[in-house]
Amino acid sequence: MRKSVIAGNWKMHMTCADTKKYLEEFLPLIEEIPNDRKIVIAPPFTAISTFSNYTNFDYLNIASQNIHWEDKGAFTAEISPNMLIEHKVKYAIVGHSEPRKYFSESDEQINKRAVFAQSSGLTPIVCVGETLEQRERGEADRVITRQVEQGLENTDPSNLIVAYEPIWAIGTGKTCEASDANKICALIRSLIGFSDVIIQYGGSVKPNNIDEIMSMSDIDGVLVGGSSLDPISFSRIANFE
């Protein structure tokens, strides 16, 4: 049976002091979550060490917001798996729509990050998703197929999370209909060819829509942005019914 993975991506938010305060409020709220799910948070790199000092790893794990495909070298602004594992990081987000957009990350680069994350002992959370223009032109399935086939080449599906994040729904307040998201997640599962691969939905996930999203047959979790910054909101999402 697939475990649900509820992940929060803090993006460029939260200082070390903010992180300490957040966790002091958040951890008691998730102490009794069911054992059919995992909770993951991706803080900014500067807060990872603070985060690791205040986290109970029985029910909450750390993710990085990106990862490089080399252990070390002249790669300014990048971070390696070894640097992260030292601070108890277990997951790594790769291919998020923001690096794709702002830094022109290609499917090939995303694939290199994902493959190296796995070989280093981390579980990659690989993001895929279409723009509004692509969706309106009826190209969503084609775009997702390309991103999955190229971005996940040579990865191990048993140590993989794929996050479907329609770009037009990220931070906009617009949510993809749960049934539509479920169809795309089913497509992703069929493309990977491994029924137990964990597939998340991301895009304006909030306390008032989490229960419907998580009721879908092919959605195994969520990748949450803004709502993960509030410990009350994120605890409600983590404790979905």
Curated annotation (Swiss-Prot):
Molecular function terms from GO: triose-phosphate isomerase activity
Domain of life: Bacteria
Presence of keyword Cell membrane: no
Record localization: Cytoplasm
Catalysed transformations (reactions): D-glyceraldehyde 3-phosphate = dihydroxyacetone phosphate
GO cellular component, one term: cytosol
Assigned keywords, A-Z: Cytoplasm, Gluconeogenesis, Glycolysis, Isomerase
Chief subcellular location: cytoplasm
Binding locations of substrate: 9-11, 171, 204, 225-226
Entries under SUPFAM superfamilies matching the protein: Triosephosphate isomerase (TIM) (SSF51351)
CDD domains membership: TIM
Enzyme superclass (EC): isomerase
InterPro entries, alphabetized: Aldolase_TIM, TIM_sf, TrioseP_Isoase_bac/euk, Triosephosphate_isomerase, Triosephosphate_isomerase_AS
One Pfam family linked to the record: TIM
Residues at the catalytic site: 96 (electrophile), 165 (proton acceptor)
Any one biological process term the GO annotation gives: glycerol catabolic process
Keyword tRNA-binding: no
EC number: 5.3.1.1
Pathway info: Carbohydrate biosynthesis; gluconeogenesis; Carbohydrate degradation; glycolysis; D-glyceraldehyde 3-phosphate from glycerone phosphate: step 1/1
NCBIfam families xref list: tim
Family: Belongs to the triosephosphate isomerase family.
Subunit structure: Homodimer.
Record function comment: Involved in the gluconeogenesis. Catalyzes stereospecifically the conversion of dihydroxyacetone phosphate (DHAP) to D-glyceraldehyde-3-phosphate (G3P).
Protein name: Triosephosphate isomerase
Record organism: Prochlorococcus marinus subsp. pastoris (strain CCMP1986 / NIES-2087 / MED4)
